Each structure stands twice: as C-alpha cells, then as structure tokens.
Amino acid sequence: MNIEKKGLLFLSYGSPSSKDDLVPYMTSIRHGRVPTDAEVANLTHRYDVIGQWSNVELQTMAERQYNRLLTLLPSIPSAIGYLHMKPSIADAVDALVKQGVEHIIAIVTAPFFTSLGTGAYEKQVQAAIGDFQDVTFDVIRAWWDQPSFIEYWVKAVSDCINDTKDVFVIFSAHSIPLINSHNADSYALALEESAKEIAQRCDLEQWSVAWQSAAPHGQWLGPTVAEAINQSLHSGAIHIAFVPFGFVSNHVEVLYDNDVECKELVDAGGAV
C-alpha cells in the first residue's frame, strides 16, 4: 500500500527587513499598484518609530515562529512561504515538491478565517500546485477555537490587568471590507465568541470588540478602535487595555497603530 508523503507549509504575511524592501512590499500588497512617494514616506515613518530597521526580532518574527513549530514536528518535510515577501508561497510549494511531498498541509499565521485574508494564501497555494501533477493540499483555515489559543490570551490579559480596577478591555483584530456580508458576519461572530470566553474567564466587567487597520477608502467592518476608545472614555474608564488577539506577533499594526496612535487618544482622554 502506498502512503502519500505529507509536508508542512507555513504561511505568513511577510515583513520588510530594510527600506529597500518597502516599494516591492507595498506594491505586492496593492496587487501591483506602485505606491506614491507620500504612501512610502508614511509607512517608512511608522517603521522608523517602532525600530523596524534595527530590530532583528521584528524582521524575523515569522521565521522564529516557523522554527518553533518545527521543534514540535521535527520529522515532517516543511517550508515557509510569504504572501508579500520572498520566499514566495510558490517558492515554498516548489521546495516541498522537491522533497517528494505529495500532500501539503498549510497553516496560516492568522487565527481567524476570512476569505480576503486566509483565502488569499489558499488561492496562491492552489495556483502553485497547479504546476505539479498529483500534488494535493489542505489548509488549516482557523485555529482560534483551540484551547491553547484561549489559554494564552487568558493568561496575557490576566497578567496585564493584574489587580487593576476599572479596566476597560478592547479586543481588536484587522478590519475587512464590507463587500461580502456573510464573510464579515462569520468573522465578527468568531471574534465575539472568542473575546467573550476570554473576558468571562478573566472576570472582565467592561470590554468590547473593535476593528483596526482599515484602509481609508470604502466601507469596513466596525466599530473602529478609535470609536471603542471614545466609548470607553465616555463611560468613565480610567484604565484601558488593548488586546490585539487577531494578530499573532508584534508588528507595525500593533506597535504603531495600538502602542502609538491609540495611546495618544487614551492620553488625550485623561485615561491610562
């Protein structure tokens, strides 16, 4: 009996290591549209503020997550591929096939599924395996409901608020365009369910779910994090804690959007 050889494909978004990476990185994100000088300058500033260019940990976060996963699965053929950087997803699929892999199991560094997010990785894997006969794949589309994910955030939130009173906790994730109401609804429901379980286990009295990092055009899933901050301030919150549990690593959307922009709003409102 023939047993097909399985391989692990670790998929991540990608992050620029130098300023020279920015234009091709942004062009890929924008589906081939080259960014303007102003757009490059804006993102450069954000990366400058968080220290991206001198922080190896920020530059190699996905690679370190991948290597950690390999310690749990040391005997399976594996490869890492990025949506917007090298090595590409096609490069990673090619590497697995060269190792004799016949069935690819892909996992994305995003705990919640969206067709625009996780689905984009899935489409690239599908396109890449089209070049090879008899190669199949499955994608682990979501893993937010795994006990270890909830346990991690319960501990993180508990450690953050400790014995602090009057804390308003804002759970956040990346917003998505409202072009597919079913996709947005299922995404929002998953976030709400996960946040509710974490909040209950942490005995949180005041909390909400909000959405961040939306593009400046079109209609996006809300409320925004800024709106949630204003709501919490209006309710008299003294302390506000952000839980960006839709992300699995520190990067610009956490270290700048939350730690810089959100902090400015909180400070201006007289809270901490």
Regions found by a protein language model. Name each.
Residues 1-272:
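Active-site-proximal alpha-helix that buttresses catalytic centers in soluble enzyme cores
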